[in-house]
Regions:
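Conserved beta-strand hairpin/beta-sheet module of binuclear metal-dependent hydrolase folds
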Residues: 3-63, 143-155, 160
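Short Gly/Pro-enriched turn/cap motifs at secondary-structure boundaries
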Residues: 21-22, 113, 133-135
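Metallo-beta-lactamase
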Residues: 39, 46-49, 128-219
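Histidine-centered divalent metal-coordination motifs
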Residues: 73-79, 137, 195, 257
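Aromatic/hydrophobic pocket-lining residues that form the small-molecule binding cavity
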Residues: 80, 176, 180, 254
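C-terminal regulatory/interaction regions
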Residues: 222-279
Length: 279
């Protein structure tokens, strides 16, 4: 299985194992951040043997400093699957946002997980990480600021190679756009995503993400104005040549945008489940 352990600075190591398992999305990253006397890990990938071995190799490369914290950016399996193995190896505390706690425990089992709040700081000895709550991709997605390197670890809020998915069932499009603006307000130079390579043009990438969402919303509003009234019709209009493996994801994105428009009072859901603009 393909393995990459890459030091992107004296402080940060990127750990990636495997091949893409979804069109356009690279394998999940783990990010190891080393201070002078302890270190922290951001996300744990799926937790398969090769991923855990790669983590141990990277950990050894920083002198096996005590691993004080494992920060989970959100609830999805490809970011939390290694919790038990890494906790058992290191004794680290597991941290997540309150909104993700129940889902993570349900997925992984009875593991004690500490809940963090916006602005929580973790001191690693000369290195400080700050938690940024950035809901949207999921209700409890978070990012992590490493201010001294002008770097934000973004989980799946911003990806290395594509736009991210906003679930209409456990995420929120309005929150997501607000979170993108929050990340931009921190003025990072670089972004370390949950999938893909380091992003070195942070402001440009964030602007592109915001622009994409505004554009997608405008195309939905235009289609509704033209008389297209349901998700099937919107899907055909907006995604005429999409890879079939992404069809359900695209439908979910349409629904997420519609949910936002409904919450803003710009669109109504009719009794038959169709949608219409509010004049």
């Amino acid at each position: 299985m393909k393995k990459s352990i890459k030091k992107i600075s004296n402080i940060v190591t990127q750990i990636t194992v495997g091949e893409p398992d979804f069109p356009g999305v690279s394998p999940p990253n783990m990010w190891l951040v080393a201070g002078f006397d302890r270190c922290a890990l951001i996300d744990t990938a799926y937790g398969n043997v090769d991923e855990i071995d790669a983590f141990v190799e990277a950990w050894n490369s920083v002198g096996s400093l005590p691993l004080s914290d494992v920060i989970l950016t959100h609830r999805h399996r490809d970011h939390i699957g290694g919790i038990r193995s890494i906790r058992d190896i290191s004794g680290a505390k597991i941290l997540c946002a309150p909104e993700e706690h129940a889902s993570i425990v349900e997925e992984i089992g009875d593991v004690f997980i500490n809940q963090v709040t916006d602005g929580t700081k973790l001191h690693l000895g000369g290195v400080t990480l700050e938690i940024l709550l950035t809901p949207g991709h999921t209700f409890g997605s978070l990012c992590v600021l490493l201010d001294q390197e002008s770097l934000i670890f973004t989980g799946d809020t911003i990806l290395g190679g594509s736009t991210t998915v906003i679930s209409p069932y456990h995420g929120d499009m309005s929150d997501y756009i607000d979170s993108l603006r929050k990340i931009k307000s921190k003025n990072p130079k670089n972004l370390a995503p949950g999938h893909g390579e380091l992003i070195t043009d942070a402001s440009k990438r964030i602007d592109a993400y915001i622009k994409h969402r505004i554009y997608r919303e405008s195309t939905i509003v235009k289609a509704l104005d033209e008389g297209i009234i349901d998700i099937d019709g919107l899907f055909i209009k907006l995604y005429p040549k999409l890879d079939s493996r992404l069809h359900q994801t695209a439908r979910d994105q349409i629904l997420s945008h519609l949910n936002k428009l409904v919450s803003e009072g710009r669109v109504q859901v009719k009794n038959d489940g169709t949608y219409g603009l509010i004049a």
